[in-house]
């Protein structure tokens, strides 16, 4: 007869022809009824609540510990299964669990006696590993393997753990206050450093902005200089172009006038020819002399008109070129003239003063004699002595002009006669 079992139990067949007994974990086996016997053993995992009440630790402090262990009979290992069958075959799971629990509780008490409360409380992992190691080596001889062991609870009736927690709490609170103070200190340092870096960055930014503004002003000034130069060149070119355009317009106008006058001359010639024919028809011989005269007059007038038109055209052209050239050269000429005058005045001090005075004397004389040129009539009254008539007027004018150097000396403090007779002195 065949018997089967699940993976959570094992079968042991003994009797006729079964020496040693046959152990089958999770499978089937053939059994001869009446002459062979079959027994079953559970391979289920057993959960054990391992309690150790008031166990004295290494320093003599009694504490209670509760651990949770998972154990089972190992069915895959034949030797362990054989050992388990020898010890637990025919026993229930509760009986097997009680035996394993007593063994674990004894090892747990032994480990507690070799450790302090602080070690058990603070390093539960170490305690669990030691219990697991010691209990496993003992239970394996029974065919039981410890799947896991975990420390569940630690307590005492003397408030030792509570006092230990208070001390630890006080230490933690102290460390927390110290940490908070250090954190505030570090935060203040970091904040001050951040403010310093912010101010430094702000100053650096302002410096960069100032540099950028300076570069902008320099570039703008250079650009303005270039723009003004180009604008001045453009204005000068525009003025030159305007002058050339005016010149061209004037030349065209003169050409038109020349053409018109040529047409007028042609009309006059036609009129002369008509009159000649008319005179010839009336009185040819008596009018030949007059005709000859008219022809000569007409030719003279024609030549005069042509020459006048050409002269006007040339004058307009030259005037336009002179204006165009003057626009471009006036500034340079004035600047060179002023520079040369300044150099001359620096080089020839008194001679330069004399040159200036002599240059202005004709203008002064012109202004003095100006009223005489505008007079329509001069009436002379004399007592009979001295010169009379135009000679008298001339003498008066010459007398005024001879006193002119004295007037200049009184006004400017410079004597023309002294400067003229001195040798030239240079600076």
From Swiss-Prot:
One Pfam family this sequence matches: Band_7
- Give the modified residues of type Phosphothreonine: 387
Q: Which UniProt keywords apply?
A: Cell membrane, Endosome, Membrane, Phosphoprotein
GO cellular component terms, A-Z: adherens junction; basolateral plasma membrane; cell-cell contact zone; centriolar satellite; COP9 signalosome; cortical actin cytoskeleton; cytoplasmic vesicle; dopaminergic synapse
> What's the protein's topology in the membrane?
Peripheral membrane protein
Q: Which residues carry this modification: Phosphoserine?
A: 19, 163, 385
Where's it found, cell-wise? Cell membrane; Endosome; Membrane, Caveola; Melanosome
Gene3D superfamilies per record:
Band 7 domain
Q: What is its main location?
A: membrane
- Kindly list the GO molecular function terms attached to this UniProt entry: protease binding
Q: Which SMART domains match?
A: PHB
A Gene Ontology biological process annotation? positive regulation of cell junction assembly
Q: Which domain of life is it from?
A: Eukaryota
Q: What family does the Swiss-Prot or TrEMBL record give for this protein?
A: Belongs to the band 7/mec-2 family. Flotillin subfamily.
Q: How does it assemble?
A: Heterooligomeric complex of flotillin-1 and flotillin-2 and caveolin-1 and caveolin-2. Interacts with ECPAS.
Job description of the protein: May act as a scaffolding protein within caveolar membranes, functionally participating in formation of caveolae or caveolae-like vesicles.
Q: What is this protein called?
A: Flotillin-1
- Which species is this UniProt entry from? Pan troglodytes
């Amino acid at each position: 007869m065949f018997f089967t079992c699940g993976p959570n139990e094992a079968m042991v067949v003994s009797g006729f022809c079964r020496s040693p007994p046959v152990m089958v974990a999770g499978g089937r086996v053939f059994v001869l009824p009446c002459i062979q016997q079959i027994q079953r053993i559970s391979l289920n995992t057993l959960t054990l609540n391992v309690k150790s009440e008031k166990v004295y630790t290494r320093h003599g402090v009694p504490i209670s510990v509760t651990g949770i262990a998972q154990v089972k009979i190992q069915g895959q290992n034949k030797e362990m299964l054989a050992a388990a069958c020898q010890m637990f075959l025919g026993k229930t799971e509760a009986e097997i669990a009680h035996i394993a629990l007593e063994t674990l509780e004894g090892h747990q008490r032994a480990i507690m006696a070799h450790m302090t409360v602080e070690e058990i409380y603070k390093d539960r992992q170490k305690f669990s590993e030691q219990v697991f190691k010691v209990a496993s080596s003992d239970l394996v001889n029974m065919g039981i393997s410890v799947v896991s062991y975990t420390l569940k609870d630690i307590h005492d009736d003397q408030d030792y753990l509570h006092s230990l927690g208070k001390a630890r709490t006080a230490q933690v609170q102290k460390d927390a206050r110290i940490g908070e103070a250090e954190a505030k200190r570090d935060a203040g340092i970091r904040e001050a450093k951040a403010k310093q870096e912010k101010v430094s960055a702000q100053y650096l930014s302002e410096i960069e902005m100032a540099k950028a503004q300076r570069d902008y002003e320099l570039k703008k000034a250079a650009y303005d200089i270039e723009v003004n130069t180009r604008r001045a060149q453009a204005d000068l070119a525009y003025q030159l172009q305007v002058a050339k355009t005016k010149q061209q317009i004037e030349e065209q106008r003169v050409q038109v006038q020349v053409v018109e006058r040529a047409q007028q001359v042609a009309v006059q010639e036609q009129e002369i020819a008509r009159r000649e024919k008319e005179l010839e028809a009336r009185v040819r011989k008596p009018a030949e002399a007059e005709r000859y005269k008219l022809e000569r007059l007409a030719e003279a007038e024609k030549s005069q008109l042509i020459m006048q038109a050409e002269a006007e055209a040339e004058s307009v052209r030259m005037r336009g070129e002179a204006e165009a050239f003057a626009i471009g050269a006036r500034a340079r000429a004035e600047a060179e003239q002023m520079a040369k005058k300044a150099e001359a005045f620096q080089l020839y001090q008194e001679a330069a003063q004399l040159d200036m005075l002599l240059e202005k004397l004709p203008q002064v004389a012109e202004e003095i004699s100006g009223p005489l040129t505008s007079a329509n009539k001069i009436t002379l009254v004399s007592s009979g002595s001295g010169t009379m008539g135009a000679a008298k007027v001339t003498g008066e004018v010459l007398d005024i002009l001879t006193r002119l150097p004295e007037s200049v000396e009184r006004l400017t403090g410079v004597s023309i006669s002294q400067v003229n007779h001195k040798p030239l002195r240079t600076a």
